[in-house]
Regions:
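Flexible "cap/lid" loop of the alpha/beta hydrolase fold
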Residues: 117, 124-168
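Catalytic histidine-centered segment of alpha/beta-hydrolase-like enzymes
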Residues: 272-285
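Alpha/beta-hydrolase fold catalytic core
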Residues: 1-34, 55-58, 96-99, 133, ...
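Alpha/beta-hydrolase
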Residues: 166-245
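Conserved HGGG/HGGXW glycine-rich cap/lid loop of the alpha/beta-hydrolase fold
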Residues: 24-73, 77, 257
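Conserved loop-alpha-helix segment in the C-terminal half of the alpha/beta-hydrolase fold
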Residues: 229-272
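Active-site loop/oxyanion-hole signature of alpha/beta-hydrolase fold enzymes
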Residues: 17, 49, 61-107, 118-119, ...
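Hydrolases whose catalytic domains are alpha/beta-hydrolase-1, hotdog thioesterase
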Residues: 111-115
């Protein structure tokens, strides 16, 4: 009997708005298409463990968002959510514009929400893992500063990121230790995989993350932006919102954001943080599969 870990994806490329972007195709062409979108500062290979368990039922496709993983960097630092939505549209055109099932984490979840709101007829079901953006409280706290002040701070941060030398590590093991220090709920095996696939040797001979450091400076379009409740209301398909009980993210069932969705359900995963699909993969997968198959 073959080991599920022997299943490997095909590495593919496509183009969007002048950038050469990368995605993983896990095969099973002809099955319903399932798109998995990673979070900020991550890459497509963080989904490997889950993709291997999903690809028997689905045609699983996992892109590297622009500026992440093996996708090209944007020369102008165009990394806002609205910059990434056309990239997803271009990927789906590459696949023949199928109706899809869509899963996104954090930044990827926000991209998924935007796409689904703009093209509701193209998404059958949407799962968002802590990807609604600012909570009402965080947005109010941000907006105590004027729009001019927010723009000024964005310019200063963008300059700071441009001038800062990315951190380098002497070894993958050192990077793994640092990652687990930042996220102690991450298993050693997954932390190693995240680092092995997400790092490269730089000109100083040190290991450095593949992502463009400029993705840390969110786009000016998000400065003083209003709550995107119009997007949430435009989504017509069933939505599963997943949150970790130990996460810093605000629970949309408690803060009122869920009322803007036509058909949404919230699931809270115990003993999990912001990366709940990594912290409790089996429990996450149970909820996700039931939702995708419409048996939740």
């Amino acid at each position: 009997m073959s080991d599920i870990r022997d299943i490997q994806p095909q590495s593919c490329f496509y183009h969007s708005r002048g950038l050469r972007l990368h995605y993983l195709d896990w095969g099973n062409i002809g099955a319903p298409v399932l798109i998995l979108l990673h979070g900020g500062l991550e890459h497509a290979r963080v989904w490997d463990q889950l993709a291997r368990q999903l690809c028997s039922d689905w045609h699983v496709v996992v892109p590297d968002l622009r500026g992440h993983g093996d996708s090209e960097w944007s020369g102008g630092g165009a990394y806002s959510i609205v910059d990434m939505v056309p990239d997803l549209a271009a990927l789906l055109a590459e696949l023949g514009d199928p109706v899809i099932h869509l899963v996104g984490h954090s930044l990827g979840g926000n991209v998924a929400i935007h796409y689904t709101a703009l093209f509701p007829q193209r998404v059958a079901r949407l799962c968002v893992i802590e990807g609604l953006g600012f909570s009402p409280e965080a947005r109010a706290r941000r907006d105590r500063r004027s729009r001019l002040e927010q723009l000024r701070q964005w310019v200063e941060k963008a300059r700071e990121v441009d001038l800062r030398r990315p951190r380098g590590y002497a070894s993958i093991a050192e990077a793994v230790a640092r990652l687990r220090e930042h996220d102690p709920l991450l298993s050693p095996e997954l932390a190693s995989q995240v680092c092995e696939h997400g790092m490269r040797i730089n000109e100083r001979g040190l290991w450095q993350w593949k992502y463009d450091p400029r993705v840390r400076a969110s786009g000016p379009s998000e400065v003083a932006s209003p709550e995107p409740s119009d997007l949430w209301r435009a989504i017509t398909c069933p939505v599963l919102l997943m949150y970790g009980a130990r996460s810093w993210a605000s629970d949309p069932e408690q803060d009122g954001r869920m009322v803007h969705f036509t058909s949404a359900r919230r699931v809270l995963i115990e003993d999990a943080g912001h990366n709940l699909h990594h912290h409790r993969p089996e429990e996450f997968l149970t909820h996700l599969q039931a939702f995708l198959h419409g048996s939740d």
